[in-house]
Amino acid sequence: MYHELGVASWGKLKADVVAVNRKGHIVIVEVKSCWADFHTDHKYHKYLPYCNQFYFVFTDTLWASHSDRIVLPRECGVLVLSSTTGLVEAVRPSTNRKMEPSVKKDMVLRMAWRAATYSKYQGTRRTRVFLQTQ
């Protein structure tokens, strides 16, 4: 899973969260922290060619207060983050979209470069440490 990953070689289109699920599908999640953040953001459709599934994630308080005003296309899923437990619930599943093979390859390479310990631009990079909780 990566945060703030550039999805296109042009411009500044960066997805909040990019992950690969168990089926090998690329999933992009756009995090919305408040109503204004969601209401003014009209770029979600630009992410669709770069993923198999696309989700918006809202806090439980934002979802409870504005779910009737949040209108999304059928292809977008909704995740709700609990402010008390920190768990995420899929309120609405995302449709599974097909990706162009060349785009999928490019996304996998972007994730691999991001995870690598070496960058041709920055020399040796820091090693990522993943902690397991029990």
Outline where the language-model segments fall.
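Active-site beta-strand-loop-beta-strand hairpin of nuclease catalytic cores
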Residues: 15-28
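Catalytic cores of nucleic-acid endonucleases
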Residues: 26, 33-82
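Non-catalytic C-terminal interaction segments of nucleic acid-processing enzymes
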Residues: 3-5, 9, 67-134
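Short glycine-rich, polar/acidic loop-and-turn segments at beta strand-coil junctions
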Residues: 5, 19-21, 32-33, 60
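Gly/Pro/Ser/Thr-rich low-complexity, intrinsically disordered segments predominantly at protein N-termini
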Residues: 1-16, 36
